[in-house]
A protein has these predicted regions:
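Core mixed alpha/beta domains of very large multi-subunit molecular machines
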Residues: 1-98, 102-115
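Conserved catalytic alpha/beta cores of large enzymes that bind or transform nucleotide phosphates
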Residues: 85-95, 101-106, 111-182
Length: 182
C-alpha cells in the first residue's frame, strides 16, 4: 500500500491529497528506477486486471522500511489500482511483476480499451465482539463464501470470450472489440 501515508496517518499527519507515489507508479527494489513494468495478480479475473506501471524510487520509503525484492509499494490513493489488480489488498497478496518487453508490449496494445471491473457493492458493516461466538459465526459465514466458484466461472467465461474472439476474428476479419457491439 502507501507505506509513508500509513505512517503519517498513525501520527495524525496524513493528507488525502498528497502521496509519495503518484497514479501509475509502484516501488520495488528488484527493478531499476523509472523502469516500465507489467503487474498481474492472481486471481486474474478478466482482461482489465493488468497494470502497466513505472517503478519509482522513493528514498523516504527506504528510510523507514526494510524492503526486499519481494515487496512492492503502490499508491491506492485516488486510483483504481486495487480493482485493476483484481481486488488487491494489503495482506500478503501475490503478483507477477515483469519487465519482459514481449509481455509489456502485449499488455499495452489494448491497455486503455479494456475496462477495469468494479463492483461498487458496499459491504454492510457488522459490529462484532471478540468472543468465541462471534469468531465461530464469522468462520461459518466465510466458509460459505462463493469466491472460489465465482473465480472459476470467470475463468471459464474468459476462455470462451477469447476462443470466440479469435474464431470470430478469423471468420469475419473483425476485432475482439466488435464482439461487444453485437
Amino acid at each position: 500500500g502507501n507505506p509513508i501515508e500509513m505512517l503519517k496517518s498513525s501520527i495524525g499527519k496524513f493528507n488525502h491529497n498528497v502521496s509519495t507515489l503518484n497514479k501509475g507508479e509502484i516501488y520495488n527494489t528488484r527493478f531499476l528506477n523509472n523502469q516500465e513494468l507489467l503487474c498481474c495478480r492472481s486471481p486474474h479475473v478478466t482482461i482489465g486486471n493488468i497494470l502497466v506501471a513505472k517503478n519509482t524510487y522513493v528514498g523516504e520509503i527506504d528510510t523507514y522500511f526494510n524492503l526486499t525484492d519481494e515487496i512492492v509499494c503502490l499508491n491506492s490513493i485516488n486510483d483504481n489500482i486495487l480493482e485493476r489488480l483484481s481486488g488487491c489488498d494489503f495482506d500478503s497478496d501475490q503478483m507477477l511483476i515483469t519487465n519482459d518487453k514481449i509481455l509489456l508490449n502485449a499488455a499495452k496494445k489494448n491497455y486503455s480499451l479494456f475496462k477495469v471491473p468494479t463492483s461498487n457493492v458496499h459491504a454492510r458493516k457488522v459490529q462484532r465482539k471478540y468472543t468465541s461466538e462471534d469468531q465461530a459465526d464469522l468462520d461459518i459465514r466465510t466458509s460459505n463464501n462463493l469466491i472460489g466458484e465465482i473465480i472459476n466461472l470467470s475463468q471459464q467465461l474468459n476462455s470462451q470470450l477469447w476462443d470466440k474472439a479469435n474464431n470470430y476474428t478469423k471468420q469475419t476479419g473483425c476485432s475482439i472489440f466488435d464482439l461487444y457491439n453485437t
